[in-house]
């Protein structure tokens, strides 16, 4: 029996209902139905595993702490087992608190280093809100990081990265060049919890169809609604190669990859940017789409006469094509090969 004819006998989900959420979008409850018997568990379990393992996010991957005391003595914390003078908590507890900060960088940013100082005289308690600077957004601002004595001043430096899943401190340490910088193990996932259940639902005279009920809790870095969309997209990308085993799928991919490479050589004038933005980019010798995405937001912001509005315009224009600043050429080619069209 041909596959196409066989699939006509399947009942495909027609309704996706967003039942409830929190105001910040960090919680969502969804129902998807009707499924043929057994497909509710299959789809629910797959979505749950992908949500918990594969949604990208941000985490602090390294830190440097220097304690300066009233008697002019100073100490750089050299390891997680070292003490921080003037801080009530031990270093392991401080690190545990730091790893619980839920934060996010600006659009398209994948790495940032932030530095700041706090004085025990002015700040008795160091909180996650102190990390909210230089475009960093914090979602649990009231989280306590450390308690400071009155005569201590701390110079702090933290590295924030974009990633997926769990990365050990040993892996993060490979990318550190400075001494007295402590690498942290990092959990990038913005998903806190996922649960699902399957209920019976009726279609016509039959009541043996599946209704999938999913609940998603996030840190706030991504909304529950966007998280389930992203998980479904990831599953689709993994299953796409299985749809057609013919050799022409490889030929088609190579053709689309070649066309995508040509698009990276396209003039930025075809992006319909404002004259001001185009002039600023021209002064930085950015003339093609490929040259534009190779720049990160920080580089462009430092350009002369390059304002916030121009940066926002460029980020918005690139995002409409699923591209972003600081994107690698390989990632851009992959995205463009998925039939993302840019008008000539």
From Swiss-Prot:
Reaction it catalyzes: RNA(n) + a ribonucleoside 5'-triphosphate = RNA(n+1) + diphosphate
GO molecular function: DNA binding; DNA-directed RNA polymerase activity; protein dimerization activity
Disulfide bonds: none
Transcription found in the keyword field: yes
Transcription is among the record's keywords: yes
Keywords: DNA-directed RNA polymerase, Nucleotidyltransferase, Transcription, Transferase
Record remark: domains: The N-terminal domain is essential for RNAP assembly and basal transcription, whereas the C-terminal domain is involved in interaction with transcriptional regulators and with upstream promoter elements.
Stated name of the protein: DNA-directed RNA polymerase subunit alpha
Gene that this polypeptide is encoded by: rpoA
